[in-house]
Amino acid sequence: MSLKHKNEYRRSIDDYQTAAPVQRRIGLYWILATLRIVLTFAPQTGYIHPDEFFQSIEVVSGDHFDIDVYKPWEFNATFPIRSMFVPQVVVGLPYAILKRLSPYTFYFFGMSLRKPYFFVLFPRLFMCALSFLSDYFLYKICYMYGQNYRVRLVTYASSYVMLTYATRTLSNSIELVLTAALLYFVSRCMAYSEKVVLQNDYLSKKYSEAATAVERVKYYKLRALLPSHSLNDCFVLATITVIGIFNRPTFVAFAFVPIFFWLQRGMNSKSVGFRDFHIRMFVFVLCGLPAAIFFILVDSFYFGYLTMAEIGQLEIGINNFVVTPVNFLKYNADTKNLESHGLHPHFLHFLVNIPLLFNVLGVIGLLTVAKMIHSGLKAQWLHLPRLQSIVGLMTFTFIIPVVLLSVFPHQEPRFIIPVLFPLVFLYAPELSQVPSLDIVRRYVNDDGNSETYSPVEPTKHKSRKLMLWYISNLLLAFFYAFAHQGGVLPLVSHITTELKAKPHLTHVHLYTSYSYSLPTALLQLRNTRRIYRSSSNHKYKLTQDFHMYEQGSKPLPWVFDSIARRIKDCEENFVVNRIPYRLYYALPASAINEFTELSSNNSHLFRFHLVNTFYPHISIEKLPSLRSFGVLEHLLSFRDDGIFSSIVATAKDVYEYVEQFRLLLLKIEYLVPESKQNRLNK
């Protein structure tokens, strides 16, 4: 008996529906969901990228609290390239709640919420709640198409992207939720439209075949009773798209495929043609206008381009409005601007970022797409997903955004985290031993009867992939949640305590090396930009008493010389103006030996001692040297006193190596020259 292969993904929506909804136990998912919440409260001290603070918390906190903040260049009023509305919702709303709760918690419990922990926690709780919306959308899509939602929810929730990235105040995390929302509403419209179109085509056929006028009237009335479907959820989809574009203009890459699939629903039928396609496109644009106008007005008012006085006097022109996505495109169109952020090869997303973010799942996705391209080149069209199917939607939503974003030479892993959603839907069953409908292949016998065959890989092979998935995500979750630049936030908490405990007139100076920028909003520095009025109606401004010098990856000799000059200036200022000071230097433990050596060679300049240690702290910019890591040498060498000494030496090397993954805070003290010391003693 010969069998003709028929691709499972080319079936209609009715073929996916089960006779009765399958209820699956998802206890493991709830455990992972609880873990996501617990890690949000922990809190995660890992520092993924400066943008999680400097494009959200640092921008908004100054609008809600009387503190000094340093808004990044993206929010410069002269040429803003980021919209303010989304950060005001994601961070501003939690901060408004925090501000109102703080007096009550202090009154009833003696606990103030004006601490770095709560400044970080409240926005992250909001983001954590948003992240669960994407879980819900994944569940609904699986349920709608009769798919195994358990295996997908567990895979989705166990990804370190959801445990770390999704709960941070990154615009990319919001992009992930918006992409999931688009896919849900589009897939719902596709399922609904396919049913209506099939019924419409069936009734049209019966109408044309009707022998009598009575039958034609009957089928005509039945067609008229069919519900409308062409413009379903149009306003919702348009609004989500506009929000996504004003959040990150790169959202166009993620919205392109879902919106295209929504526009071309039913195009292979007799009742839907290009006229419907163009009508949908026109109405979609119209539905997006209210949201676009709203965002433009909000940004124009916030950045000072538009005022109520100008509106009252009708002095309004085109220059009174700012469109931040347009400014964003203008900025990124210039390669010279991207050079300051770092230029990368165009294949970085495919070769590095996808495996890094999605590990096993990403590799499976890339291999599957490669097979599809091979099938397309061989004109094996039945091996490709049907354009009208949910699998076609998810496949193109995975690959097209990555291709479009690869055009830009600046590529970071976080740029493509929204493709986790389609990846999980498509390939999560590959990691599980539980069969899923979307990996069933159907064959048609010579007599026309269909048979189903479920190719199940060997359990051992699948269990290896599943084990690799869990282990890699566990390690990466720990790395990004606690280890990567993990000493920065504890350092901020320490400096905040130091600023509150110091004498009133004392100035604090802080140098940092090989670490990300400290979010100054968390330090709650007193506002030096605001003009205050005294009780006698005198105007005054506060003096800046905290000074930060971020040295980045500058060579330590340069940093050493800068510290020497700074402490000399501070000492002279203390002698002349009687302004006391404290000077600190934060650097990775892997750099302390070099700094100590520089200090010993220039012992007449200053001295230092260790104040605090923050662990773990992994700085990719200054990893410990492997030359001091003599494990292999000790294991392969046999000493006179036996192998036990080699094991002890190896353990000591490992301990010393791990100990270098710390952030050290040094206090720098001025060293009075001997000649001056002698004069003082006399």
Predicted features along the sequence, with ranges:
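Membrane-lumen/periplasm interface segments of specific transmembrane helices
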Residues: 242-342, 346-347, 351-366, 405-408, ...
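Extracytosolic helix-loop segments that constitute the early lumenal/periplasmic catalytic or substrate-binding loops
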Residues: 37-42, 53-81, 85, 89-106, ...
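Hydrophobic/aromatic-rich transmembrane helices and adjacent perimembrane loops
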Residues: 172, 253, 346-367, 389-395, ...
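Short acidic/glycine- and proline-prone juxtamembrane loop motifs at membrane-interface regions
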Residues: 49-51, 167-174, 412-413
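Transmembrane-helix motifs of polytopic, lipid-linked glycan transferases
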Residues: 97, 121-148, 181
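Membrane-embedded, lumen/periplasm-facing catalytic core of multi-pass transferases
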Residues: 433-590, 604-615, 660
